[in-house]
């Protein structure tokens, strides 16, 4: 998603761009064998199906949750070996208004305190020492797909050239000037593409971007990143675990307390996170608590959800079919409408099971790493070899969050609205980490920083070791905090595009594709 946005921004500055996509014009459902990796410990769950190749990449499959990192997430946290970001909070969020407009998000605040237009009559606690409540925004289905958003602006743009089914397989580097001269791409069917440019941007997701950087180093005989101790290291992901079941005691107040809020079509949801003070006291990383429910268990809500999806997809035949076979319960439908129109919340029926989960930031560790393995993919390229596993500090973060949340829930009197039945693995002596899985938010292996030995890119996403290469994505995160990464990725894309555009002085002359090159599928 970041690469398409950078391309759009550069064309707006009169710069010619070539977009090279490893996947097809649209991501194909199911697993892509090019995403397969070698996993030394067998711990990582989502390397194949948790990411998508194709125009728009993983933006075609993500849920749409957008929330900033907290100011504390960007600071040095020596108790978990997390370095400071090379950007202050205000610097990082300079492009926030533009990114929110791109996804058609409202301009309301994310910070603690329910937005004033919600008339719920029930408020989550504020000012607690252990937990703060922020408010995430959700992109609608049609506005979460980056290719859907930008296709009209890029597909026929005179300065944009787009190639699909073109996987980078070789780099040509001038080792003396440390400049990238060209890339060579293959599609596995005998077609090849060579691109020369003044500046290159790598925005292929954490796993693939890191693999390509390691391949670039190999093409440079191991000399390009020889002085860098960070490339491929500090692989991390959010870890998510079920911790309890909610027992609703006051249904009316429950859905007005925890249900998603709406303003028009804009969805907001509470993001309950461990405070910086609690983290320092316990010497643990960030974490947040969230509720999940399968609303399709309720016939009325399941029908409404399917109808809404058909409508957003402009699938009017499917919409008609759903209407013909639907059976909407008048009472549930009436409460749903009343909740949305008056309280601006989603009606949460009593026949749906609600689960409590904790999602933690994994502490960065040098030994968790990506390297090029001996196994090859169908294009003959080395697969990612991952050495990664959770650590003791991750278990402590889970346990600290669970223990403090239990006390918080009772201290604030929320157990009178709904109780919590804690699962067995949350008890003393058990392991929460063993019940957890990665959250498909990989990051950290090309981290930002000011020291070229300890980081791969600087605060403008420019590679310390290759003069004309930018890397954009969660791979550049020094730490992941307790926020979904998509908003931060897009803010970094905004920053990188601005820096590149400022540095480029010769418009419409920066990309050269040799005439002899052949593309597999030119969009």
Regions found by a protein language model. Give the residues of each.
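N-terminal Rossmann-like FAD-binding beta1-loop-alpha1 element of flavoenzymes
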Residues: 1-19
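Glycine-rich loop(s) and the adjacent beta-strand/alpha-helix scaffold that form part
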Residues: 12, 25-26, 48, 171, ...
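Short, solvent-exposed loop/turn and secondary-structure capping segments
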Residues: 28-31, 58, 64, 73-77, ...
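Redox-cofactor-proximal catalytic regions of oxidoreductases
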Residues: 36-112, 363-374, 378
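Conserved redox-cofactor binding core of oxidoreductases
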Residues: 78-180, 426, 430-438
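FAD cofactor-binding and catalytic pocket of flavoenzymes
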Residues: 103, 228-231, 240, 244-382, ...
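A glycine-rich dinucleotide-binding beta-alpha-beta segment and adjacent secondary-structure elements
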Residues: 163-176, 339-369, 379, 383-478, ...
């Amino acid at each position: 998603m970041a690469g398409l946005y950078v391309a759009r921004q550069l064309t707006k500055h009169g710069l010619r761009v070539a977009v090279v996509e490893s996947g097809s014009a649209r991501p194909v459902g199911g697993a892509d064998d090019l995403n397969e990796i070698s996993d030394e410990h067998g711990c990582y769950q989502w390397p194949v199906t948790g990411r998508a190749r194709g125009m728009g990449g993983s933006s075609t499959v993500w849920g749409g949750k957008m929330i900033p990192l907290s100011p504390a997430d960007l600071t040095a946290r020596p108790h978990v070996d997390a370095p400071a970001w090379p950007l202050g909070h205000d610097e990082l969020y300079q492009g926030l208004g533009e990114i929110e407009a791109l996804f058609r998000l409202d301009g309301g605040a994310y910070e603690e305190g329910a937005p004033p237009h919600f008339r719920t009559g029930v408020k989550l606690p504020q000012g607690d020492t252990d937990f703060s409540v922020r408010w995430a925004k959700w992109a609608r289905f049609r506005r979460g797909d980056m290719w859907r958003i930008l296709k009209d602006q890029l597909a026929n743009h005179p300065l944009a050239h787009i190639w699909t089914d073109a996987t980078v397989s070789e780099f040509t580097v001038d080792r003396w000037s440390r400049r990238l001269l060209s890339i060579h791409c293959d599609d596995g069917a005998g077609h090849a593409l060579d691109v020369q440019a003044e500046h290159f941007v790598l925005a292929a997701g954490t796993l693939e971007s890191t693999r390509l950087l390691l391949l670039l180093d190999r093409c440079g005989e191991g000399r390009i990143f020889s002085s860098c101790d960070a490339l491929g290291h500090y692989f991390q992901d959010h870890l998510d675990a079920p911790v309890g079941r909610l027992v609703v005691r006051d249904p009316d107040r429950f859905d007005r307390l925890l249900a998603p809020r709406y303003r028009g079509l804009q969805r907001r949801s509470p993001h309950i996170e461990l405070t910086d003070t609690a983290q320092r006291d316990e010497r643990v990383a960030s974490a947040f608590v969230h509720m999940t429910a399968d609303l399709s268990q309720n016939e009325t809500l399941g029908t409404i959800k399917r109808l809404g999806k058909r409508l957003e997809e402009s699938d009017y035949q499917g919409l008609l079919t759903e209407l013909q076979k639907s059976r909407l319960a008048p009472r549930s439908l009436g409460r749903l409408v009343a909740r949305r129109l008056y309280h601006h919340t989603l009606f949460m029926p009593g026949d749906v099971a609600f689960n409590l989960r904790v999602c933690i930031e994994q502490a960065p560790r040098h030994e968790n790493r990506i390297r090029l393995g001996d196994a090859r993919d169908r294009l003959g390229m080395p697969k990612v070899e991952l050495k990664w596993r959770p650590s003791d500090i991750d278990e402590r973060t889970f346990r600290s969050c669970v223990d403090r949340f239990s006390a918080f829930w009772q201290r604030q009197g929320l157990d009178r609205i709904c109780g919590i039945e804690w699962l067995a693995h949350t008890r003393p002596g058990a392991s929460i980490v063993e019940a957890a899985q990665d959250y498909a938010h990989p990051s950290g292996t090309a981290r930002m920083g000011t020291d070229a030995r300890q980081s791969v890119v600087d605060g403008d996403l420019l590679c310390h070791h290759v003069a004309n290469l930018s890397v954009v994505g969660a791979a550049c995160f020094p730490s992941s905090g307790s926020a979904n990464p998509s908003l931060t990725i897009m803010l970094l894309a905004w920053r990188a595009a601005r820096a590149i555009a400022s540095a480029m002085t010769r418009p419409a002359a920066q990309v050269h594709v040799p005439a002899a090159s052949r593309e597999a599928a030119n969009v």
